[in-house]
């Protein structure tokens, strides 16, 4: 299908047969309308299923009727209509009334982002210990591509598939290897994460909270970007 024909087809699916050029389909207008309705229903169903598969924990936690009502509102938004199925779901939490459900939705979306992020070798404490002092101070660090975090609205109510280690109001997601890991961290750790959103020399982190930094390294959230070669 030519690009202009595809665009016209897309407009007809979204807004009805009145937006369909007369030469796009063969047959009578009623037949075209029936065909478009069937296709539109199939697309709508597929988008609902995609949202359910994006948020399986949320779907289990919520009343199904409330989930689908929020899904209907979300999927009807103009900026959402044009998204492909694999990009569907970001921002869904804004259509949820309860804070605990918003936390869960944001966590599930960040889990997907972490899972699909680029590969990288996570920094370890052994890596740092192997560096000479001058090289260590000159080394640059940045976040692992899979690192994600969010501040929970209701930390005490947050629930996942398994017990999450750590304390604090910040949920940290990392993927140093194949598995996405979750743990709770505090505001000091979140401050370090924010600082490492851009490449930073180790010397700029000398004032950081050391236990928090060690926690982040152990979680596989940081990569060694460069080391000065002598």
Task: Kindly give the residue locations of the regions a language model identified.
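Long, charge-rich, low-complexity alpha-helical segments
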Residues: 1-132, 178, 183-230
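Short aromatic-glycine motifs in intrinsically disordered, low-complexity regions
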Residues: 134-136
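Low-complexity, glycine/alanine/valine/leucine- and proline-rich hydrophobic stretches
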Residues: 140-198
């Amino acid at each position: 299908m030519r690009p202009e024909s595809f665009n016209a087809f897309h407009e007809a699916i979204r807004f009805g047969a009145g937006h369909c050029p007369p030469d796009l389909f063969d047959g009578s207008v009623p037949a075209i309308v029936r065909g478009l309705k069937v296709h539109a229903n199939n697309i709508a169903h597929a988008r609902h299923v995609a949202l359910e598969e994006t948020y399986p924990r949320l779907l289990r936690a919520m009343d199904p009727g409330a989930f689908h009502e929020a899904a209907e509102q979300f999927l009807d938004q103009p900026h959402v209509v044009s998204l492909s199925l694999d990009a569907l779901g970001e921002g869904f939490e804004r259509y949820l009334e309860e804070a605990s459900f918003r936390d869960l939705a944001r966590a599930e979306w960040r889990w997907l982002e972490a899972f699909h992020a680029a590969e990288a070798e996570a920094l370890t404490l052994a890596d740092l210990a192997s560096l000479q002092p001058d090289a260590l101070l000159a080394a640059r660090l940045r976040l692992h591509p899979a690192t994600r975090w969010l501040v929970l609205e209701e930390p005490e109510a947050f629930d996942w598939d398994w017990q999450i280690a750590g304390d604090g109001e910040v949920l940290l997601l990392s993927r140093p290897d194949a598995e996405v890991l979750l743990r709770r961290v505090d505001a000091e750790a979140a401050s370090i994460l924010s600082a490492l959103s851009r490449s930073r020399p180790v010397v700029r982190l000398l004032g950081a909270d050391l236990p928090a930094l060690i926690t982040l390294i152990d979680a596989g959230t940081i990569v060694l970007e460069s080391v000065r070669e002598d």
